[in-house]
Amino acid sequence: MADEDLIFRLEGVDGGQSPRAGHDGDSDGDSDDEEGYFICPITDDPSSNQNVNSKVNKYYSNLTKSERYSSSGSPANSFHFKEAWKHAIQKAKHMPDPWAEFHLEDIATERATRHRYNAVTGEWLDDEVLIKMASQPFGRGAMRECFRTKKLSNFLHAQQWKGASNYVAKRYIEPVDRDVYFEDVRLQMEAKLWGEEYNRHKPPKQVDIMQMCIIELKDRPGKPLFHLEHYIEGKYIKYNSNSGFVRDDNIRLTPQAFSHFTFERSGHQLIVVDIQGVGDLYTDPQIHTETGTDFGDGNLGVRGMALFFYSHACNRICESMGLAPFDLSPRERDAVNQNTKLLQSAKTILRGTEEKCGSPQVRTLSGSRPPLLRPLSENSGDENMSDVTFDSLPSSPSSATPHSQKLDHLHWPVFSDLDNMASRDHDHLDNHRESENSGDSGYPSEKRGELDDPEPREHGHSYSNRKYESDEDSLGSSGRVCVEKWNLLNSSRLHLPRASAVALEVQRLNALDLEKKIGKSILGKVHLAMVRYHEGGRFCEKGEEWDQESAVFHLEHAANLGELEAIVGLGLMYSQLPHHILADVSLKETEENKTKGFDYLLKAAEAGDRQSMILVARAFDSGQNLSPDRCQDWLEALHWYNTALEMTDCDEGGEYDGMQDEPRYMMLAREAEMLFTGGYGLEKDPQRSGDLYTQAAEAAMEAMKGRLANQYYQKAEEAWAQMEE
C-alpha cells in the first residue's frame, strides 16, 4: 500500500491540534514545528494517549539523535531518522482521498455484521460496523466484482465519513455457497502467517498479505456476504499464478522466493502461490496443501506444487536463505535458465544478513505473530530488542521500521517512504492504524480504554492488551495466545523445515525404518505429479512430443523418495514388463537395466506390493527376469510366495491389492511342488508338501474349481506316501 493510502491524523504531543497546511498563513510543510507532533491513527482513542504523553517528549528527543541507518531498497543512501519522520508527516498532511470525487459519504449508511478470523486459534469473531457501499461495481474479474466502500471506525464519536477508510467490497458474480466466503478468508489469513514467518528470516524485502474479513448485510434481501479489504493504490501485478510462474516485464525475486520458502519452511506440507498485489503487499493468494482438500477448489495439492517448481528458477534470495533448488532434468533446467536470465534484471540487492530457512538463529518475537512454528527453532524465544539497528526499509508495507518496536510501547504507528515503498511495523501486532497491518493474524476485542501498563517488559517488549479497534478488520494481538494453547490447537502443523532437493530428502528417509519410509515423502509425491504432467502433455506445446526423458528422471526421483507407484513402475519398465505408468516409454534391454529393474521390484516387494512379491518369487523360482547378479533360489521363492499369500492388509503405500492377479490355490500348489521335488537350495519336505496341496485343494473348491481340487488332493496323497517310504 502506498503512503498516500494511509489515512491518519496528526495530533500534538500535548493534546493540541496540528496546524493544517494552507490555513492561517502557515503552510510551510517543512516547518520545524513538525517536531512537536507524532502520527496517531484515527482508530486510536485519544484518551489512551494521556497515559504515555509524559514519555513521548523524552522518547522523541532521543529519536532525533538516533544514528543514520541503511536501506536495502537503496543501500547507497542513508537517511537520518528524524528526516524520515518529517517526510512521513509531510506525506500525511498532503494526502488526498482518491475516492473523494465519488462522494461515498452521500450514500445511505448500512449496518453490517463483520466476521473476522483468528488464524491462531481458528476462531471467528463477529461485531457490528457501519459502511457506505457504492451501488455499482467499479471493477470486475473472472469470478468477482468489486464495490467502492467506506467503513466507519467504531471509535469515532461522530460519523465523520469523509475521513473514513477506503475499502473494496468483493462478491462472487455467480452465486456460491456461503462457506466459500469464509474459506477464502481463512486461506488468506493462513497465508499471512507464512508471510510473517518469511519476514522473520530477514529477507532483503519483506512481504505482507492483506487483511480480509467478511461483512454480512443483514438489511438486504438474502443477507448477502462480501469480502472486505483495504483499498490499495498502485500497479497491480500478478507475480506467479495458481499453476506456475508468470513471465512479466516487471520481474521480481521476492514473490518467487516467498513461495519457495513456504514449501521448505512448512516441511513440504504446503506452498503459498498465486502471488499478486501492489509491490510486496499481496492479496488473493492460493495455498496448495499435501492433501489438496483445504482452501477451496483452487487447492491443487501436490500437482500445484509440481506446477510451481517446473517453472521456478531459484534466485539470489533463495540462495541467501538456504533454499535448495528443486531437482529438474537437464532439458527442464535449460528451459528454466531462460527465466534465470530474466531475473538478472531484478534490482533487489542482498544485505548478507538473511537467515537460512529453519535456522535455529531465527527467533520468534513474542507478540509479533501467532506462535506458529515456534517450537521448531531451537533458540526460539524473545529477541533482545536492545539492538534495533535498522538494516533496511523494505518495499513492503509489512516491513519493520527502524524503531518500530520501541515506538510500539508508546502506541505509535510508524510510517516511512523510500523509493515509493511504504514500510510499516511488521513485528508487533498491537500497532493500530488505518493502514494495512502486517503482523496481525489474530482479531482484537473492540472495547475501549482498557490499557495495560505501557512500560516495556523484559527483553524490551510490550505485551499491551489494548482493546482498540484495529481497522484492519481481522486481527489483533496474538501475544495473548500462549504457546502451549496454540500447540494444542495446531499440533499437526508443527513440522521441521525440509529442503527441496532429493539428495537431502533421501538422507532423511534413510534414517527411517522401511515402513516409515514408503509413501511418506511429500517431495516424492511432487516428483510423481511431474511425471503425470509430462505424460499428459501439460509441459509441451500442442503437437509436440512430450519429454519422456524428463518423465523418467522424475519417476526415478519419486522412487528414490519412497513412492511405491514409482518403484513398481520403474521395476516393470527396466525389466521389460508391461507397466501402466509411462506406458509408452520403453528402455533399452541391458544387464544394467535388468539389475535396476529387479532391485526396484525387490524394494517394492519389501514395501508390501503383492504384485512385486509374486514377480520376485517367480524370478527366483524359474530364473526368468532375474537380474544377472542373482541365481535361482527356491528358498527365496518360497519366502516371497508365502509373503504374498499372507498379504491381506494394505501395502506401505496405503493401497489394498487382492488376490485377483494370482489365485491363492495356484501359489499354494507351486509351493507344494517345490517342496515335493526340492532343489536350488530348498530341501525336500513331503509332509509340508502334502499339507500345502490340501490347502490348495480347499482354495480351489472355494473358487469353484472342483476338478482341479481333486488333482490337488491326489498329489497330497502322493506326497504323504513318499513320506512314509
Curated annotation (Swiss-Prot):
Keywords assigned by UniProt, alphabetized: Acetylation, ATP-binding, Calcium, Calmodulin-binding, Kinase, Nucleotide-binding, Phosphoprotein, Serine/threonine-protein kinase, Transferase
Documented activity regulation: Undergoes calcium/calmodulin-dependent intramolecular autophosphorylation, and this results in it becoming partially calcium/calmodulin-independent.
GO molecular function (one): ATP binding
Binding site for ATP: 296-302
Alpha-type protein kinase domain location: 116-326
Biological classification of the source: Eukaryota, Metazoa, Chordata, Craniata, Vertebrata
Residue stretches of biased makeup (Basic and acidic residues): 1-12, 423-436, 445-469
Modified sites of kind Phosphoserine: 18, 27, 61, 66, 70-72, 74, 78, 243, 359, 366, 392, 398, 435, 445, 470, 474, 477, 491, 500
Maturation and modification: Autophosphorylated at multiple residues, Thr-348 being the major site. Phosphorylated by AMP-activated protein kinase AMPK at Ser-398 leading to EEF2K activation and protein synthesis inhibition. Phosphorylated by TRPM7 at Ser-78 resulting in improved protein stability, higher EE2F phosphorylated and subsequently reduced rate of protein synthesis. Phosphorylation by other kinases such as CDK1 and MAPK13 at Ser-359 or RPS6KA1 and RPS6KB1 at Ser-366 instead decrease EEF2K activity and promote protein synthesis.
Name of the featured protein: Eukaryotic elongation factor 2 kinase
Cross-referenced SMART domains: Alpha_kinase
Chain intervals for the UniProt region annotation (Calmodulin-binding): 81-94
Domain of life: Eukaryota
Record-level GO cellular component terms: cytoplasm; cytosol; dendritic spine; glutamatergic synapse; postsynaptic density
Job description of the protein: Threonine kinase that regulates protein synthesis by controlling the rate of peptide chain elongation. Upon activation by a variety of upstream kinases including AMPK or TRPM7, phosphorylates the elongation factor EEF2 at a single site, renders it unable to bind ribosomes and thus inactive. In turn, the rate of protein synthesis is reduced.
Protein's UniProt keywords contain Lipid metabolism: no
Assembly, per entry: Monomer or homodimer. Interacts with Calmodulin/CALM1; this interaction is strictly required for phosphorylation activity.
One of the Pfam families matching this protein, by short name: Alpha_kinase
Gene3D superfamilies reported in the protein's UniProt record: MHCK/EF2 kinase, Phosphorylase Kinase, domain 1, Tetratricopeptide repeat domain
Gene name tied to this protein: EEF2K
Phosphothreonine: residues carrying this PTM: 348, 353
PANTHER family per UniProt: EUKARYOTIC ELONGATION FACTOR 2 KINASE, EUKARYOTIC ELONGATION FACTOR 2 KINASE-RELATED
